C-alpha cells in the first residue's frame, strides 16, 4: 500500500496536527508494515495559489510553453500523480479562520481535475477515485463541529473528497486547543488514545 502523508499547518514543531499525523502514520505502519510512505509538507513546500497563469500554462501547447509554464505544468502533474498513486492518505487539516489552510486548498486545486479525478456525464459529476482511504487529523482552537462555523472545515473536506469518489474518511479530532492547558492536554490525549486503540482496530 502507498500512503501519502500531508501536513499543512504553518506552526512547525508547535503544531498539534503535525504531531498527530505523525502518530497516525506510525500506528498505520505498525498495522501495515509493508506500506510505502511519501511525505509532503504543504506549508514549507507550498504550492502557489491556482491562478490565471496556471490555467494558461495547462492550455498552452507543449512546444510553445515558456520555462515558467513548463515548471507549472510539471509541478501540477507531479502533485496529481502523487495523489493518484496513493492508496491511503493521512492529512493534517487544522482550522484557520473557519476553514482549511490555503496551502491545503491549493493542493485540492491540483487534484480536482476534470477527466482525471472526476468527469461530467448526463447524470452529473462522477468521481473517479473510489477505493482510496483518507484519514484526516482535524484540529482547531475552538469547538466548531456541528456548528455553522464548522461547515468550511470538516464538511468542506467531506464534500471535496466525495466529489472525486472518496467516501472512506475517518477523522481524528483534537478541538478546543486554545481553551487552556488542561483542555488542550485532554483533547490531545483523547486523540492519541483513539489513534493507538481504535483507529486501526480490526
From Swiss-Prot:
Function: Quinone reductase that provides resistance to thiol-specific stress caused by electrophilic quinones.
Keywords assigned: Flavoprotein, FMN, NAD, Oxidoreductase
Keyword hit for tRNA processing: no
PANTHER family found in the cross-reference section: FMN-DEPENDENT NADH-AZOREDUCTASE 1, FMN-DEPENDENT NADH:QUINONE OXIDOREDUCTASE
Cofactor(s) demanded: FMN
One Pfam family here: Flavodoxin_2
UniProt: FMN binding residues: 9, 15-17, 95-98, 139-142
GO molecular function: electron transfer activity; FMN binding; oxidoreductase activity, acting on NAD(P)H as acceptor; oxidoreductase activity, acting on NAD(P)H, quinone or similar compound as acceptor
Uppermost EC category: oxidoreductase
Quaternary organization: Homodimer.
Official protein name in the record: FMN-dependent NADH:quinone oxidoreductase
Cofactor note: Binds 1 FMN per subunit.
Membership in a protein family: Belongs to the azoreductase type 1 family.
UniProt xrefs under HAMAP family: Azoreductase_type1
InterPro entries: Flavodoxin_fold, Flavoprotein-like_sf, FMN-dep_NADH:Q_OxRdtase_AzoR1, NADH:quinone_OxRdtase_FMN_depd
EC code: 1.6.5.-, 1.7.1.17
Catalytic activity: 2 a quinone + NADH + H(+) = 2 a 1,4-benzosemiquinone + NAD(+); N,N-dimethyl-1,4-phenylenediamine + anthranilate + 2 NAD(+) = 2-(4-dimethylaminophenyl)diazenylbenzoate + 2 NADH + 2 H(+)
